[in-house]
């Protein structure tokens, strides 16, 4: 099984775009526990964003994005996630934007790797009024490590457009990075970086790339609840200037742990 997973990782690396402001999260390697489900609500409000319709895509300025995510642990190292994306703008009202499916596999603990390692593949549809990519595939390797109170995670994400406004010349490179420190027993503070460099064979010009930095708080050591929240600041003209995100999750264990 070990070699099949490694081969799958190698193949996926040769395919796939950054998260838009619907699900803003740097993944950890741990999959959802077997026979348990986590119900998550991602609430992201754009205080300062795009104000014009660009390539048929509606503005993000003062948009409220609510995403429902449901993830179930199938085995000790495999989970399946479902997303429902919604958008509210005062001039357009409330809209359902699309849905995604995301299977994820994690390396077994018995391998005793020095880092956590998992791989997710996310595929789905978004309305052309809210995304330049109507059908897309995302491959997300996840590498993380805990050193006592310090935590770091790297998601060197690749995205491929299956259908969209314009043809995509190559997979897009969209890395995500998280670093945090547990200043308190149950609370950590840290930073999250979200990038979108553009196609691998020809990165976008620097002002056209997406780069954002979030200052975040995480709830720790709670088997039932997950909380991640904080403001994000766009670092380039192509990135929304100010977004505030709140992620609240509730785990349900269908059988005794």
Tell where the protein language model's regions lie, with residue ranges:
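Bacterial Sec-dependent N-terminal signal peptides
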Residues: 1-22
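Transmembrane beta-barrel domains of Gram-negative outer membranes and organellar outer membranes
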Residues: 18-257
